Amino acid sequence: DDSFVVKALGTGNCENIIFKNSVLWNDFARPMEVGVELRADKVRNIKFENIDIIHSDTGYPLMGIHHGDHAEVSDIVFDNIRIEDTPGAQLFDIRIADSVWNRDNKMGDIRNITFSNIKYLGTDNNDILLSNSRIEGYSEKHNIRNVNFQNININGKYALTPKEPGRNVYEF
């Protein structure tokens, strides 16, 4: 299943978690994930740092935050991530949506997400790696805010800014 995953199945907070200095080979689901089950009051201060994804052939997002419960999700950092063999994958996927794993009848929100120093070194997949990546809130009230991208490098080219506001199509 997911290689590194943060879930919050009970009450209280889920916070101050660091995954670092690791090499991931992923055969099913996502290499790095926060969610889907996020039933705590707060899920915050989660960091994925200095990680190599050397294989993930699932087509799933490489870095994901999937939320469908009531938690306030904030301050999630993906930093110094190197990616190699990942055919068909999305670079990231951040969503608030209903799912079969949700137990709450109230949605939360997602705030302050940082992707920095991400380097993709694969031989294919360039066309969908970013274009299929998405940021998708649930409603105006339950939304995603303050997502930052710094130094995103795809095979030697830096992703700059969205080509069109509101779309996940990036130019190099």
Predicted regions and their residues:
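Short glycine/acidic-rich loop motifs that flank beta-strands on beta-rich extracellular proteins
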Residues: 1-8, 15, 24-34, 52-63, ...
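Surface-exposed loop/turn motifs in large extracellular/passenger domains
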Residues: 10-20, 36-53, 67-83, 99-122, ...
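C-terminal effector modules
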Residues: 162-172
